[in-house]
Amino acid sequence: MKKTIAWKMAVAGVLIAVCVVCSPLSIPVGASRCFPVQHLVNILAAVLLGPFYGVGMAFVTSLIRVLMGTGTLLAFPGSMCGALLCGLVYKYSKNIPLTCIGELFGTSVLGGICAYPIAALLMGKEAVLWTYILPFFVSSAGGTVIAVSYTHLTLP
């Protein structure tokens, strides 16, 4: 099946809607909210759409969640770094388990590092750099487990 721009935009819109509708399923951990559905969608976007659609979807979803009051500013670095890394990993490897590891590393380590200046400068929260890595890992791990199960059952 040829994936046209219209098809990709439609799938992206549906996945963004799933993330926004499932926003109440977040779990507070530390200064952030763990949102496993975002990480499931990041992996699905990597496999179905590619890295740049994934980053765009993560941005739009985070923006909508912040505007609705169901997310924090920390949603941006975690979801976008995870989406970019897992998208790039899948683009070049076509390996779903490796893509899931990319999502875990991108969200927890890279997203956690990028969250520090946002928390310190924009939110006024003083913390050490590694404070955000563990909560982001917990959130990403939940979504990654769901994604591995889902992709194993539905994708070839």
What are the language-model segments listed below?
Residues M1-L153:
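Loop-helix junctions at membrane interfaces
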